[in-house]
């Protein structure tokens, strides 16, 4: 069984925030708290350690009280570059990732991904949800992987690859069904952020 203490959580906050007008998504307040802090609180309860991947506003992220790692791959190469930065610093046998703008991620996310890896003898696990229209949606930016995956990730990135799904599919991959698609909602725009703020006030 993969123990909680052998899993490092990695919050991916290294993007450009282009869909949010270039602002740093992880530092945008939701209910008065930075979004990345909401994600940190959810993820840290499920893992032995937590890292944050960020490429700007490092002091702000360091104030969260966990180590901050920056991309070693240049030019904002996407979430896989952030995953590599995490794996380069990971001190446990496993690492699980989550984007900084996922403040509602399931509280049993890591446990269920780890259990599926054990049951299916898989290497990587990602969630899959069914949206309101009945469409099956994989959530590859939420990924539990062994620390040893660093070698294949380096090779994939060096070959110009940037898609999580393609890299993940090169491993023994298990997709784990989750009923609550809203728990994986990313807040990508300021309008979406304001919508969630309004829902909170209305409730």
Curated annotation (Swiss-Prot):
What GO biological process, any one, is recorded here? bis(molybdopterin guanine dinucleotide)molybdenum biosynthetic process
Q: Which UniProt keywords apply?
A: Cytoplasm, GTP-binding, Magnesium, Metal-binding, Molybdenum cofactor biosynthesis, Nucleotide-binding, Transferase
| Catalytic activity as recorded in UniProt | Mo-molybdopterin + GTP + H(+) = Mo-molybdopterin guanine dinucleotide + diphosphate
Record's comment describing the protein's domains? The N-terminal domain determines nucleotide recognition and specific binding, while the C-terminal domain determines the specific binding to the target protein.
**What task does this protein carry out?**
Transfers a GMP moiety from GTP to Mo-molybdopterin (Mo-MPT) cofactor (Moco or molybdenum cofactor) to form Mo-molybdopterin guanine dinucleotide (Mo-MGD) cofactor.
Assembly behavior = Monomer.
According to UniProt, the name of this protein is Molybdenum cofactor guanylyltransferase
């Amino acid at each position: 069984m993969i123990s909680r203490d052998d899993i490092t959580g990695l919050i991916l906050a290294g993007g450009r925030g282009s869909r949010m007008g270039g602002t740093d998504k992880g530092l945008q307040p939701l209910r008065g708290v930075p979004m990345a802090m909401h994600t940190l609180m959810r993820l840290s309860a499920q893992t032995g350690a937590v890292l944050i991947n960020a490429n700007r506003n490092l002091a702000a992220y360091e104030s969260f009280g966990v180590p901050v790692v920056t991309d070693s791959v240049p030019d904002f190469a996407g979430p896989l570059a952030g995953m590599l930065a995490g794996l380069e610093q990971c001190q446990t046998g496993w690492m699980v990732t989550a984007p900084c703008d996922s403040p509602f991620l399931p509280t049993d996310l890591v446990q269920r991904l780890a259990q599926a890896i054990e049951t299916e003898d898989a290497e990587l696990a990602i969630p899959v949800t069914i949206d309101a229209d009945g469409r099956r949606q994989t959530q590859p930016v939420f990924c539990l992987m062994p620390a040893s995956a660093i070698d294949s990730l380096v090779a994939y990135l060096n070959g110009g690859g940037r898609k999580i799904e393609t890299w993940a599919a090169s491993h023994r991959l298990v997709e784990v069904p989750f009923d609550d698609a809203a728990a994986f909602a990313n807040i990508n725009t300021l309008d979406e952020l304001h919508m969630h703020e309004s829902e909170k006030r209305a409730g």
